[in-house]
UniProtKB/Swiss-Prot annotation:
Disruption phenotype: Complete sterility of male and female gametophytes due to altered meiosis. Striking reduction in the number of meiotic crossovers. Belongs to the XPF family. Highly expressed in anthers and pistil during meiosis. Expressed in pollen mother cells (PMCs) during meiosis. Expressed at low levels in roots, shoots, leaves, flowers, and glumes. The lineage of its organism: Eukaryota, Viridiplantae, Streptophyta, Embryophyta, Tracheophyta. One of its GO terms (cellular component) is plasma membrane. This is Protein SHORTAGE IN CHIASMATA 1 homolog.
Amino acid sequence: MRTRFLATDYFAPSSSSAAGKALALEFFSFPSLPVPALPPDPHFLPFTSADELPAATVADDGLGPLPIASALSDFLAAVIPQALPVPTVPAADEVLDDFLYDRGGYGEDFSSWEFGAFRIPKASEGYGVINREKDEKGEGSRSDGLEISSVMKRWEQLKELRFEVVEVDLLMALQEDIASFGEEESGGGVTLLLRVPDMKIHLDFIDIETDIKIRYQSDLPESVYQVEKVPVKDNDGNGHSSLREDCCLEIAALDHGAVIPRLEVSRNSWELDDCLTETDRYGVFDNVVRHLDEAQIQHSVFKSTEFLRSTDMDMLTFVCEDAPCHDIQVDKPAEIKAAVEMDVVRINGNILLEKNSALYPLKPDGTCSDLPCSILLEEVQIIDFPSDNVFKMLVQSETNKMNISDEIFKDDFDPARRLYESMVSCELALVDDTFRSLPTPILNDDIAVRSRVPPIQEILCSLKPHPLSASDGIYLDWHLLLEGPCNREICCSYASMVEEAKTCHLSSELQRSCQSTSVFVSDFLEDFQRSPKLQDEDKHSDIYVPAPLSHDPQKLEATQKCEQEGGTRNHSSMKRPSPEKSSSFPELISHSGDLNFYLNVRSATKSGTNNENTSTLDVPHSEEQALSLSTRAKVDKLIEIHPVSPSNLIQGLIEQIHASYTSALQESTYWRHSFSDEQGLGISKQKLLELITGEGSEGSYNHCEHKDKMELIVLYALKQVAYYLCFFGLHAAHLYISNLTRSLENTPERLKHILWSISEAQRKSERQLFESHPSLSCIETILRSNKQIDQKILIVADRAFWLPLGQKLASMRMTFVEFGQNPATTFVDLVNKTNSTAWVLEELLKSDCILLDNKNIPASFPFDKFGIILEYGGPNKSSTLLSLAPKLDGLPPLHFLYVKVDGKDFPAALVEDNHKDQDLKSTLDKVLLTLQKDLQERMNKMRIVDSLNFIPATNQLQGLQEKRSKHFAADATKELLPDDQPHRLQNLNKKNTFDSHNVVLADEQLHIQQTLSNKPVVNSQCVPTVEKSSSTSSVSANVLKDPQENQSTTDLPSCVKNDCIMPGRLSVPDVVIVVNTGNHGKTMLVSRRSSYQQILALEKGGMQVVERDIDLPVDLILSAAVCLVWYETALFEANELTTSAETSGIKENVENIATNILMSVSFSFTGCIMVFEGEADFLSAVMDSSDSLYTAAASLDMNLQLFFSHTPRSTDEIILNCITNVTSCYKAPLPDIPESESLAESFLTSFPSINPVSAYMLLSSGGSLVEFLSWPHERRIQAVGKYLLSPKIISLFNALCKFGELGESRSVMTECSSVDSDISSAFLQSPRKRKQRSLQACAVPTNKLLFSDSLNQIPGDYAEHAEVFSPSKLRKFSDMDNTIPELPDVFTFDESLNMRSEGFSYQQKKHDVDAIPGNQVINDDFSNGLTPNNQAYNRRTGNMVDTFDLPWQPEFGGTHPSKSTFHTSRPSCSRTHSNPVFSTAFEINDDPGEWNISGGTKQTWKGLAHGGTVDDSYRYDMDNRYHEPRDEIMQHPASSLAFQKLDFGSHATSQGSCWEIDYLRQMSAKRKARQERSRCSNSPGMSIPRMRDSNSKILNPPPKESFRYRGDRDTPSRDQSPSIGTQHYGKGKEGAKAQNRRARKDFNVQPTSHKKRIEPSIDPTWTPIDKRARQKLSFVTYGKEKQSKLVWRNQNSPGVGCGFRKRFREEGT
């Protein structure tokens, strides 16, 4: 690989021939020059010293004759090396110079790692070789005696010449005894001076153990001759270098400053030494500071590229094609400030400076470089391979491109060493990381490597199989596990095998081992129906596995005694083993003897005993057991015990309560005087109650003040809430602590924290994230296993557990009834309940299970009528039914559950103690006696004690309401059971007569309660409900047909009833009012202090008032669908334009409200209440312009109601009445709305269809916001169904999320797009098709009267012509569904923006109309609340006040129905299909319990206000039930149109009412009249077949004339201005004939012709000429505007009547 120079030094003789060459030189004949003597030098190479030779000189004054001797002297001085003397050890500060002596002193192109610079003196300077030593004191004299001045003189005259780096045969040099040199001269490296003057070579070593790699710089020239330097380890203590190997010690002894290239691999490790000594550290910094500012860099006269003159190619690109380009950084000395901040680091004796994990080198002159060192510390693993394998793998490697013959590797190691030396030679251009890892590569030979599979196979083959046991033959066939899911046939076959196995006889020892026998179960059959054969054999089962009574020592002893003294059983004769054999028997039971080991396939193998989870009890039923246990008869029942441990959540809450309890004990001064911590924790609640009341304190009551009693109350409350939380779950605990905090005037902080924690957990439980109590999961498993075989179930539990238990039963769709809640079954004597059996038998026909109180078990209860009994003991570890076993006959199989509180870290003392409910009466009496203050204080005291003793139970009605709301929300389309019918609750608004803090006991003790409190018992007709703060979702599923059976007194205190809520104590409010604090160009209601203070006062009644800055111009948000806007005269005066008439400005403002404000409000609300306040002239002008408001509201599909007021006081009354009526109607559960706006609310309210109330409905729908956005449209509607949120809001929200903003569909108001952005939109169709459809849409006229009448009839051909109502046709125009959804709610129509459904479907609900309570037509509470001035103005405006279905009352005996504030009514233009809208005026003036508001999909709100359900299965058989109308009905215009737009689903009332009969007759008359007019109005001019076949109807926004002032009521009415409506076109032959079989008195029938179509009037009204409209209200766009606006246009203007709204235009099919 050598290309230019050989590494052989011909002038350096070897040790063997040194003497011979010395003699050879003696025979050289040099003229006039003696041969110098060359004695061997023991310290270095044996050459003659150059100082002994005469120096050659050259004259400076011209060239003279040169003798030959002078030339030979110069030649010899130039080519013959000479020995140099050994210098002395340098000073300590020379360490820096020796370590970095070769950096920065050889020119600008030389880096800090450059080696091999040669300095050749001139001929006149002699043959001296100058050392780099800088000792100016003259230490270490030279062998020739030269002075330091001459040496420095020659040094300055040196000339730098650059040659090839000379290789030296180090083996010869290492064999000699080399003296040691100074420890810090060469910086840890080894230097060697050759004969060549001033040439120094560094000996560096590559440490294989630590993988010290050669560092290659980025530039190509430097990479040719640079070799990384590895310094030798240096220690501080001994003052000299310490190396590991002897050869390295010899090399380190060379103290000549020469640098030797790296030629061989050594195994020296590079390790980090300890820190420098104080002396060395001080010397380093002193040298740095002195030389830092004086540093200078010497530059070379030659460029480094001179070494590459022999090559013409770029070796960097030759080795690596994609070599990175690095900029060469100029080495500059660092500033002294930066150097002082650095840390001194010593690595193997080398001193470096560290800053920010970077090492900076020190230069020889003491300066510090600003370029960090490239030192790589890396550990690699070196694996020694045999030489033959190494090179064999190297040759066979695919990456090896070298063709090396086998002759090179004939020797063992030498050839490999030569190859490696050639690879690491400095002549190789290592410019990148190609050769960075120099250790021998590990190349695996895939052919030679042995596979791991054969050894594993050999090991497996060598294993011996386990010997077969005798039990292998009884294993079942396990192939069913390999077939995937088991089918029913296979499992039934194995069930038969199990049945056959039951006939085996067990030994007496197995039967006697009570505590250690596993239960015989077959878990792999638990998911399948039990076979009839198995069920039949269960009734005659002869297998009895007796066990002691659970955890009761007395019962256990009695059972054992009975076993020893009892006679033989009928089915077998058992021997009684000794106790020793019984105790040792469990240890002898193996897996082979356990049948569960073989049969339990699906639930994994269970072995040993399992008496903690399930035990079997065989309890006698003979009456003689109470007297004597000598004999007992066979009992045919199996008892299983299921211990339940508290969940982690409950344990965490109890630990929190325990921590609060402990801290209260430590902070209480009273307890420090009375009890220790342990005594305070173990004190019973009865003792705490005595200390609170002051009775039985025995002297400790003397220093118990009011503050101490409050601490006692907190301690008692903590113990009680922990008790309910542990044994009855989150619901009971939440009810208890909520009731207690409302009873206290100042709630302690400890109770607030506990209340907040339990409330958070309870809300999560309502979302079904986890169970409120862990026993509910076990109960569900037991009930589902028995529900499949259709068995009646009896559940015995404490009343406090009925609430979560009822929720679980309701979620399982199981009906149940609570025993003892019916007044007919309430008796004082619990034993003599003679009618309990009959009542149970009657209820079992309608219910799946019965709930029974474990404290109230009658002796005559028919237990044998149930297939299974489930008893929840809670804190009781023994069964209550088993204690009554002698009195119970035929007890069916029993499942007993109890809570197991045994645990090391569980505070059992905090939850186990509980006072008896029987002591409640005596405690209340003692409270009144111990308190000696005034009556008010005694009452407060009694309330506190009552709250402390509050039992969190529920009643039947609460369960019924919550179950219904959740059931309809979860599955609105599921058909209810026939027995699941609601019942009318007629007196729900009556006030309860209980004291707000009285405690209600069990209904069997109501007479005692009445005696104590001297207060009447609640009437059975009035069923109090639990307040909403209980936060229960679904409880009871039982349904009773008799209203008397569904109403009873309850054991709840009346403090939790709706009518007796304490002010400001409602944790979850029933009503939320949102007040707008924004500024929208008008005076906001919040700015009027008097009005806003009255709204804030509503919080005392349980309402919540929340302030929000809303972008909409509304003042109040009463619900998710209704808002209230208030205007005063000042607004209109400020905004009045400069006109001559004052009213013109008011009209313009009213039109602005109609076109802009109503438009923006219509996206978020379906109902709006406007209150105008001002003087009479102002109100008159607003009334005259109110037609535009009604027309705009009807066009926008909104319900609008106007109120007018003179004074602020009357305005406040109107607003408060509106709040009361709206909130009383909206009885859906409300979400928890915080006081401050959240980020999610801000995001949702940015959508135009979402307001703050509906935003939190979406957020409380059961998932996070991200999950809600990922749900489909149907899932979203179903999720918010329980809140009765309008599906229109969700549909618009989905449309905005789906389509975004596209093209001309962008709205300038909402910055969102409409449904026209869809790809199927008509706007995206071709102009020709769009124009054709537009002409078709405008060409079909409409008949308003025809459609108004059609609302009162169900077409009989819906099923035959279902294709008429295709989705594409339903979406054409805004008012298309006026003909469809306003049909009776017997039919419901699903309609949304998502048109994936095909066709038009309707569904008939199967409910009874009797379930809906009767309507009270007029309620004067709201109307009488208005001032007389308001009534006068309302009478003046008549039907202009409301677009709702205004109150109407038919004639009864000729009397005029004028009790309402509004005397007339007009048709409402709102659509009342399945979307919930704001109640009509008819409903708002009706009884709150009878309001009719659409409530979600396929239901209305009728009856939901007080727990009733929607039942709209009214059968409208028009042809059979309708009769001819009376003529007098048609005389009054108001009566003719009173029910024209009413929601039929809301009028399914009791049969036989007078107004209903008149109503049905009127509908029949309208139906027949419409049929006649339909035949007369058919236009024969419409001859296009496609148009004639089309059954689509197009509705324009209602005309303004329908809202005009009617004038005097007695004036004969006749409509003079026909309006454009919708007309039916028929195909019959009589289509062109005018048939007027029943002409109405107030309607003129005009004959039709082919040339002109006669438009019938909307209704028989008469409009004064001065009040008739000369313009029409339509939607238009101006210029480039993309948002249409509602403006008045002339009737003759083009396009009037065809300006349909953009969002309802026809989309392409």
